[in-house]
């Protein structure tokens, strides 16, 4: 998976949140969405992303939440297959 070409992920200090920038505006990401998207680099698989997040946040069962968010992001056109 990778970010779609028209989007740029950026930490927005004024918003105190990760945002997706695109030509027409900005999407403020809630919760762990930014943490997930920072791990999308065109090389990691979904399982790699889940494993990386599990290491960063031990004790949390994140797999289904990550998969649900990735499906949402794909449906919105924020991410695309490599």
Regions found by a protein language model. Give the residues of each.
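Long, charge-rich, low-complexity alpha-helical segments
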Residues: 25-82
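Acidic, low-complexity/disordered tracts enriched in E/D and polar residues
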Residues: 1-38
